[in-house]
A protein has these predicted regions:
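N-terminal pro-sequences and low-complexity stem/linker regions of secreted or lumenal proteins
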Residues: 6, 11-12, 21-267
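N-terminal signal peptide c-region/cleavage motif recognized by signal peptidases
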Residues: 16-18
């Protein structure tokens, strides 16, 4: 999608047909989330970008992935179920993107490939054939859209290719990429301005899977998130999915119904 079409869709997204659920945010106004690859909590918690998340946000110290390999974990994050063990299934299942698109006004989902191309198995919206409003490439594109091309309420999925998300490349490179994302969000009025009810956009960051017990680093970050908090409440990818649907005031998806929402960053 070119920039003109992208901005046209974003402008149109504030309107929707009648008869659908009202769009409401409970804890945040918009959601940005991204995922790194294949490292356990203790392997990465000391990285500079992760220490920044710990200082300025809320770390979920007992957060776990739900499966192996990558694909099922990504699907669990956005749809509340793994839908099998295959890396990709390329089949429609309800996801946070499809239910958000059904609200009034609709809340659109955008996918940003910040470095290279997100692998298909790491792009659950593509895998689940979700309704995505726009696909953009490069951190500069995100920075430009944050300056005026995004609706006030949106879901942004940000990702990197396997050389830049710690799958194949060094931790230092991935760390720099996450730091660049944090700097970009912190410098944008879109991410740092509350809505009429005082809610800010929020960033959720985690790893898809780890070693053995699958405990991974996960954190929430943003102006509305409690700073310097470490939660010891157990959570999983299903809990993230449950948190998104609860924030929208919608029923939970699939197995996420059996998980509680992540509330510690706001309570």
């Amino acid at each position: 999608m070119d920039r003109r079409a992208f901005l046209g869709w974003a402008a149109a997204a504030v309107f929707g047909p009648p008869g659908r659920a009202e769009a409401r945010g409970r804890w945040w106004s918009s959601l940005v989330f991204g995922v790194f690859e294949n490292h356990g909590f203790d392997e990465v918690a000391g990285l500079p970008s992760h220490r920044r998340l710990a200082r300025e946000g809320t770390v979920l110290a007992r957060y776990s992935a739900v499966a192996h390999p990558s694909g099922p974990n990504y699907r669990a994050l956005v749809s509340g179920a793994t839908w099998g063990t295959a890396q990709t299934i390329e089949t429609f299942h309800p996801s946070i993107a499809s239910i958000a698109a059904g609200l009034v006004p609709p809340i659109p989902t955008f996918v940003y490939h910040l470095e290279g191309e997100i692998a298909r198995r790491h792009n659950p919206f593509l895998d689940l054939r979700a309704p995505v409003a726009g696909v953009r490439h490069g951190l500069a594109a995100l920075r430009s859209d944050l300056a005026g091309g995004l609706p006030p309420a949106a879901v942004l999925y940000v990702g990197w290719d396997d050389l830049n998300n710690m799958h194949d490349g060094p931790p230092a490179r991935a760390d720099q990429n996450l730091s660049a994302l944090l700097d970009t969000l912190a410098a944008s009025a879109w991410f740092t301005t509350p809505d009429r009810e005082g809610r800010y956009p929020a960033l959720f960051f985690c790893y898809d899977e780890g070693r053995l017990a699958n405990r991974v680093f996960a954190a929430w970050w943003g102006r509305g998130v409690r700073r310097g908090r470490v939660s010891q409440v157990p959570h999983t990818h299903y809990g993230f999915c449950r948190t998104v649907t609860d924030n929208l005031g919608l029923p939970p998806l699939a197995r996420a119904a059996g998980s509680g929402p992540i509330t510690e960053p706001w309570t």
